A protein has these predicted regions:
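Core beta-strand elements of the Rossmann-like FAD/NAD(P) dinucleotide-binding domain
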Residues: 7-9, 194-204
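Central beta-strand plus flanking loop segment that forms part of the substrate or channel wall
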Residues: 54, 221-227
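Glycine-rich FAD pyrophosphate-binding loop
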Residues: 28-48
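N-terminal Rossmann-like FAD-binding beta1-loop-alpha1 element of flavoenzymes
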Residues: 10-35
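Short hydrophobic core segments
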Residues: 14, 200-210
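Dinucleotide-binding Rossmann-like beta1-alpha1 core, especially the glycine-rich loop
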Residues: 52-125, 129
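Flavin (FAD/FMN) cofactor-binding and adjacent substrate-gating region
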Residues: 94-164, 169-170, 176-183, 188
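Flavin (primarily FAD) binding-site architecture
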Residues: 207-222
Length: 227
């Protein structure tokens, strides 16, 4: 009988937001042993403090086609695998009297090229869809934006990751990295519940700490300026 030592994992993930939770689930589904560390509780950083908009990528279509394609791909994935976390509200890009109505076709063409469904609608239809819209609008384009519940999405990923063997440790503050030369072998962590310092080891350490990722990078003598 093989007894797993909880100090050792294939992957350690630092950060319990949407990104960390998604990585934990993906790794666990691939059969890797996973330890996720969060210094507070899940989704208490930027994940729990954002507007919850699920971008279609339309806003980037004309000026940044690559970002637009990435957005719509993620949008479609989340609608497929996390429908219970998503509300498909759609979004409107409106044209006002001071705008160039001809740009509407440029916008639709760019959206279509990026794989984003964009539909021109008349002002009356736009007003029916959104009664608070500026009544002076000349036209509108409907795109597949939506809203997503960030906490619910994070919790769902965490639960599925744990069901597939991941170890989720909240109240665990990473205080340093364990290094061998230029290679990170693990982390030093403070367990707030038991008031003790521990060392955990993994073949791969993922920095998913959001804005605090700069501090984690500094433990490895890396300069990643985030603020």
């Amino acid at each position: 009988m093989t007894i797993h030592d909880p100090r050792f994992s294939d992957v350690i993930i630092i950060g319990g937001g949407a990104t960390g939770a998604g990585i934990a689930r993906d790794c666990a589904l691939r059969g890797l042993s996973v330890t996720l560390l969060e210094r507070h509780d899940i989704a208490t950083g930027a994940t729990g403090r954002n507007h919850g908009l699920l971008h279609s990528g339309a806003r980037y279509a004309v000026t940044d086609a690559e970002s637009a394609r990435e957005c719509i791909a993620e949008n479609q994935i989340l609608r497929r695998i996390a429908r219970h976390c998503v509300e498909p509200t759609n979004g409107l890009f409106i044209t006002l009297p001071e705008d160039d109505l001809g740009f509407q076709q440029t916008f639709i063409t760019a959206c279509t090229a990026a794989g984003i469904q964009a539909e021109a609608i008349d002002p009356a239809q736009a007003r029916r869809l959104e009664p608070s819209v500026n009544p002076a609008l000349l036209g509108a384009v409907k795109v597949p934006d939506g809203t997503v519940d960030p906490f619910r999405l994070t919790a769902a990923n965490m639960l599925d990751a744990r069901e597939h063997g991941a170890q989720i440790l909240t109240g665990h503050h990473v205080t340093g990295l364990i290094r061998e030369g230029n290679t990170v072998r693990g982390v030093r962590v403070f367990d707030a519940q038991y008031n003790e310092h521990r060392e955990l080891y993994a073949a791969v350490v993922v920095n998913a700490a959001g804005i605090w990722g700069q501090r984690i990078a500094e433990y490895a003598d890396l300069s990643v300026r985030m603020f």
